[in-house]
């Protein structure tokens, strides 16, 4: 299976999960939009839950990496005696997300819609998996505030 196949599955899932929610989206719908068979989804992701996690990881991991890079820079400046300003910490947290959503194009809007849906999902396991992606970043940012 090609990387393009995996990306088509992720794009299809992201859009459908954003529009209909996790529970209301079937793997059959995802395979139809992605133009792949069910075996391809199972091969790449194993389950619908793992697919949702991959959708989030694809967008959140690079954003979090950039957040931490910016925070590292602020902490390095602080080690040299420069005071860390609250504005700089907030910018280090928010700017990577804004830049990423803008860079994702139309898929960025879908992803933000999906993030909003995740906050109203009733499946606690999914909510916990989603929030777990942000926990390491939160643990680094909170002490600096």
Language-model region placement:
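An amphipathic alpha-helix adjacent to DNA-recognition modules
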Residues: 3-11, 45-72, 131
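Helix-turn-helix
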Residues: 8, 16, 20-50, 54-55
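Short alpha-helical functional segments enriched in proximate histidine and acidic residues
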Residues: 16, 62, 100, 144
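Hydrophobic alpha-helical connector segments
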Residues: 69-108
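Amphipathic alpha-helical packing segments from all-alpha helical-bundle domains
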Residues: 88, 110, 123-145
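Short alpha-helical scaffolding segments that buttress acidic/His motifs in well-ordered protein cores
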Residues: 93, 97, 112-119
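Amphipathic C-terminal alpha-helical segment
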Residues: 99-103, 117-128
């Amino acid at each position: 299976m090609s990387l393009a196949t995996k990306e088509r599955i992720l794009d299809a899932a992201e859009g459908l999960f954003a529009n209909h929610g996790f529970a209301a989206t079937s793997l059959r719908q995802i395979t139809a939009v992605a133009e792949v068979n069910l075996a391809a989804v199972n091969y790449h992701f194993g389950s619908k839950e793992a697919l949702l996690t991959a959708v989030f990881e694809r967008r959140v991991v690079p954003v979090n990496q950039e957040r931490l890079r910016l925070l590292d820079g602020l902490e390095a400046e602080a080690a040299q005696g420069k005071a860390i300003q609250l504005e700089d910490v907030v910018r280090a947290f928010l700017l990577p997300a804004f830049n990423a959503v803008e860079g994702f194009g139309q898929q960025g809007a879908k992803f933000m819609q999906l993030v909003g849906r995740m906050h109203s999902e009733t499946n606690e396991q999914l909510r916990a998996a989603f929030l777990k992606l942000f926990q390491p970043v939160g643990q680094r940012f909170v002490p600096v505030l």
